[in-house]
């Protein structure tokens, strides 16, 4: 699959398909969107929010969560604020999210089946990583959005004038965003 993508890219570049996407690194709307990496949102999310290329920084991860005050999602938001001029942040979760109800036992079985040994997992634990928590999903989408919004709003490095709001989008039917 990667070879097919690279071959497509060669054609894309040679035909200058990139020209209509040229913009600078600063988001025109001074907006960052933290959302889930779900493939249903790839085109739906920007379309449902009326965003075009260059309007916003879109940060994606499993569940659209900030799971720690100093995780990579939070780091990206801090960079967006201080380096890219972001003044508003939308946390956008979605219905029927795969990260909801994730559990370590499932991941453990899949890892073992794919050749990761218990010895490796135990070594990671001995290094202080709580794999159970790290791979745990959330039980309620509304609660996860509120928690993420609160983590961002109360972060010691986020200025008080940055607007942070949370939404849930219907990823299967209408693309409607609601609080």
Name the predicted role of every residue range:
Residues 1-29, 64-69, 81-84, 99-178:
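Divalent-metal-activated hydrolytic enzyme cores
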Residues 15, 19-74:
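Conserved beta-strand-loop surface patch within small alpha/beta domains used
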Residues 34-36, 60, 92-94, 167-170:
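Short beta-strand segments
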Residues 37-40, 95-99:
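Gly/Ser/Thr-rich loops at beta-strand to alpha-helix junctions
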Residues 82-94:
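Ordered, amphipathic secondary-structure segments that act as subunit-interaction surfaces
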């Amino acid at each position: 699959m990667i070879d097919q993508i690279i071959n497509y890219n060669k054609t894309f570049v040679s035909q200058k398909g990139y020209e209509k996407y040229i913009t600078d690194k600063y988001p025109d709307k001074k907006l960052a969107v933290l959302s889930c990496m779900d493939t249903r949102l790839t085109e739906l999310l920007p379309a449902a929010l009326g965003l075009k290329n260059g309007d916003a920084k879109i940060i994606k991860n499993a569940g659209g969560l900030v799971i720690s005050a100093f995780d990579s999602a939070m780091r990206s938001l801090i960079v967006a604020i201080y380096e890219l001029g972001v003044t508003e942040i939308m946390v956008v979760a979605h219905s029927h999210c795969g990260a909801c109800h994730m559990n370590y036992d499932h991941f453990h079985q899949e890892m073992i089946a794919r050749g990761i040994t218990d010895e490796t997992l135990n070594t990671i634990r001995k290094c202080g990583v709580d794999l159970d928590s790290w791979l745990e999903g959330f039980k309620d989408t509304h609660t996860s959005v509120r928690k993420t919004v609160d983590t961002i709003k109360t972060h010691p490095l986020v200025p008080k004038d940055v607007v942070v709001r949370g939404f849930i989008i219907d990823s299967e039917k209408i693309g409607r965003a609601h609080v």
